[in-house]
From Swiss-Prot:
Entry annotated with the keyword Cell inner membrane: no
Gene: TSA1
Induction: Up-regulated by wounding and jasmonic acid treatment.
Claim: Endoplasmic reticulum is one of the keywords in the record: yes
Secretion signal span: 1-29
Designated name of the protein: TSK-associating protein 1
């Protein structure tokens, strides 16, 4: 290494002497003033050469320390490249001094050209080394890297030329200074990248990059990662550019308010989805107690309704906020209409949920319950999809400024998709409503058929009602029995209707006795209505006495007298009073009317009205027949319901017990199988253990013999490797000396040519 340092110093001194001789020759050909300036320039160059020599000595010392941990080939090649670079830089400086430096930019350009020449020289050396190794693939890869570095240096040279041209043509204003600064920074980055690639190429050339494929894959992956990062950065820049160009129409407060409202709507939707899921679970696992199950379903539906109403209010608020934004009128109107349509869909969904609440109060069979559960699951999925759409819409609202055409179209498509999801959900609710109404219609039809059968039985039991009609009409003229005959209360216990056609007559079997009905009514309501007939008779007598006191005389049995006094004011007032009382009961159904405690008083009032108004058909007599029938029907319905609930409970108990039996049986069977398998494994392991012990003894004997042979082979191999390493070191030393001699010869030839050219 010391010999190499001495040779390097000698070459540098020789080069300096050549420069001095050429400079003196030029001084002799010039005048005195120019000669002094050239001498000063030569002196400065000589001082620079000495400083460079000292720097080279320091680098050689550091390289010497580093070479103790590296092979000789790497150190030799590194010094060779350093020497060639220094020589080329010296040659460049000599030629530049002969022409004269115009500016600092020309000097930088010359340094880059010197680096370019060194790159070409390194490329030729790399090609020679690779031709020796016959590795075409590695040579192509190295050549490609050299070409890339060359392109980068050419780009740097072009940038310097452009910078020099701009410096000549333009002034030193601030804009030009900034441009020049950016170009210089770009050149510096390219130079650093090229330097790093040269170092990597140098290491690969001198150490032999055998893992070329692995290195190439690693390089490719790094480039792809960088490319992805750049693409992400470009997208971010484009997004930032769009945001800067369009501007933000909403201030921070408005954006925060919209975001909070959208989050609130999202929470409402999630709560509604959870409620629907809970409702589905409740419907699939119907509670044993039907009343408790109905109450639970009612509470869930009411909770869903509240959630939807809250979401509707949030949408209204969002609608108001969005209407105040400074946007285009067309886009604002379109958005307003979409939000209003979503609001209407919410309200329709709320109404449908109320209707569903009414329909789900009754009990349904297993098939109907399964169908409803399936439809509720579909509705839940639709609402979840709508929730996802709202989340996406929230993100877009938070990041967007004024709506341009692309954002408006995207927003419109998302709102339309949410609308379709809600329409599908509402369609599912409507389908549930239709199915439940169909079931109610079927039940109503069944009840109607039962009532028609009862009516036919009444007609068959009293087929001779027409024959009795004349008797009832004649008996009606008698004052003592007027009201009972109007009600159709006969002495035989049967009931009929007076002044009716054959098709409209309704009768009941004789098994429903009027006396029994009256006794039952007196037991329920006390002594005031102990006898319906007596009460009605007393009412008629009181009415007769009142009329006789007012008019003097009145004969109710005479049709002519009744017709002459029917327009009296007292009778009209009484009729109007009774009509007003009866009109108050107009909203009640027949079942509700019969089950009232004052049903007897209502019958008396209705009979009085029909008597005083001379009604052609007595409807109140029909109503009196159905009281016990309706009560028995209600009691039968309660008994049926109790029986169904009891059967359902017993079925569930039996199912649970059978499930427990099946579970214990499966557990016992599984344990038996595991016990048998473990027994087989234990037996096999014992047998295998015996075989393994015998095999281990055999392997131990072979191992001892192999160890003895291995000790002899290790000694022979160590001696062979020592001889091999000695031969390799000797060959590398000889190769380093040969390459150094070649490099020195080439450098001397170049210096000699330059010297001759300067004469």
């Amino acid at each position: 290494m010391e010999i190499y340092t001495m040779k390097t110093n000698f070459l540098v001194l020789a080069l300096s002497l050549c420069i001095l001789l050429s400079s003196f020759h030029e001084v002799s050909c010039q005048d005195d003033g120019s000669g002094l300036s050239n001498l000063d320039l030569i002196e400065r160059d000589y001082q620079d050469s000495v400083n460079a020599l000292q720097g080279k000595d320091d680098e050689d010392q550091s390289a010497k320390i580093q070479s103790e941990n590296q092979n000789n080939t790497t150190v030799t090649d590194k010094n060779t490249i350093s020497l060639s670079l220094s020589d080329e830089s010296e040659v460049g400086s000599v030629s530049d001094e002969s022409v004269g430096r115009s500016s600092l930019l020309d000097q930088i350009k010359l340094e880059f050209e010197a680096h370019h020449n060194s790159i070409n020289q390194a490329g030729s050396d790399g090609v020679k080394a690779e031709s020796k190794d016959d590795d075409e693939e590695l040579s192509a890869h190295r050549q490609k890297m050299l070409e890339e570095i060359e392109h980068e240096f050419e780009a740097a040279s072009d940038s310097l030329k452009q910078l020099k041209t701009d410096d000549v043509n333009e002034g030193n204003d601030e804009e030009h200074s900034a441009k020049r600064q950016s170009l210089l920074e770009e050149i510096e980055r390219e130079f650093e990248a090229a330097t790093k690639e040269l170092e990597q190429l140098k290491v690969n050339d001198f150490t032999g990059d055998k893992d070329d494929e692995e290195h190439s894959a690693k390089r490719k992956s790094m480039l792809e990662a960088i490319e992805r990062e750049f693409e992400a950065a470009m997208e971010g820049i484009e997004a930032l550019k769009v945001s800067d160009s369009t501007g933000s129409g909403d201030d921070e407060e408005q954006s925060a308010k919209r975001l909070s409202m959208l989050e609130e709507i999202e929470r409402e939707f999630e709560a509604a989805s959870k409620g629907l899921e809970q409702l589905r679970a409740s419907d699939s696992t119907a509670d044993n107690n039907e009343e408790e199950h109905a109450a639970k379903g009612q509470s869930l539906l009411e909770e869903i309704e509240r959630e939807f109403e809250a979401a509707t209010e949030s949408l209204k608020q969002l609608q108001v906020d969005d209407s105040t934004e400074d946007k285009e009128h067309f886009t604002a109107a379109k958005r307003q209409s979409l939000l209003e349509e979503i609001e209407r869909e919410f309200e329709a969904a709320t109404k449908d949920l109320k209707q569903l609440n009414d329909f789900t109060e009754g009990s349904a069979d297993d098939e109907q319950s399964a169908k409803r559960n399936k439809m509720l699951e579909d509705i839940e999925r639709e609402f979840e999809a709508a929730t996802i759409g709202l989340e996406q819409l929230k993100a877009n609202d938070f990041s967007e400024g004024n709506n341009n055409e692309e954002q408006s179209a995207k927003r419109k498509s998302m709102l339309e998709e949410i609308e379709r999801e809600f329409e599908a959900a509402i369609g599912g609710l409507k389908q549930i409503k239709v199915d439940d109404s169909r079931n109610l219609e079927e039940e109503s039809a069944k009840r109607k058929i039962i009532l028609e059968e009862m009516e036919r039985e009444f007609e068959e039991a009293h087929s001779g009602i027409n024959a009795k009609a004349d008797k009832e009409e004649s008996a009606k003229k008698q004052s003592g029995s007027a009201i009972p005959e109007v009600l159709g209360l006969g002495q035989s216990g049967g009931c009929s209707c007076s002044k009716q056609d054959e098709d409209s007559s309704i009768v009941i079997p004789t098994k429903y006795s009027i006396e029994d009905i009256l006794s039952e009514e007196s037991a329920v309501q006390g002594t005031e209505t102990s006898s319906l007939t007596a009460s009605l008779t007393q009412l008629v007598e009181n009415h007769r006495k009142e009329k006789e006191s007012l008019l003097g005389h009145r004969v109710l049995t005479s049709p002519s007298i009744a017709s002459s006094t029917s327009e009296s004011s007292a009778t009209s007032e009484t009729v109007e009073t009774l009509r007003a009382k009866l009109n108050e009961l107009r909203g009640l159904t027949a079942r509700e009317l019969v089950t009232r405690k004052d049903f007897g008083q209502i019958l008396i009032t209705a009979a009085s009205f029909e008597e005083l108004s001379s009604a052609p058909i007595s409807y109140i007599s029909r109503l009196a027949k159905y009281r016990n029938v309706i009560k028995e029907g209600l009691e039968a319905s309660e008994r049926v319901h109790i029986a169904q609930v009891r059967a359902k409970m017993l079925k569930e108990v039996a199912t649970e017990k059978q499930t427990a039996v099946d579970t214990h049986f499966a557990t016992a069977k599984k344990l038996a199988q595991e016990g048998d398998a473990l027994f087989v494994k234990i037996f096999a392991i014992k047998k295998l253990l015996a075989k393994l012990e015998a095999e281990k003894e055999s392997v131990d004997g072979k191992f001892k013999e192999t160890v003895k042979e291995l000790s002899h082979l290790l000694a022979d191999a160590s001696e062979a490797y020592e001889e091999y390493h000695g031969a390799v070191r000797k060959a590398k030393d000889e190769q380093a000396a040969e390459e150094f001699a070649k490099e020195a010869t080439q450098s001397a030839e170049i210096i000699w040519v330059k010297f001759l050219s300067s004469l």
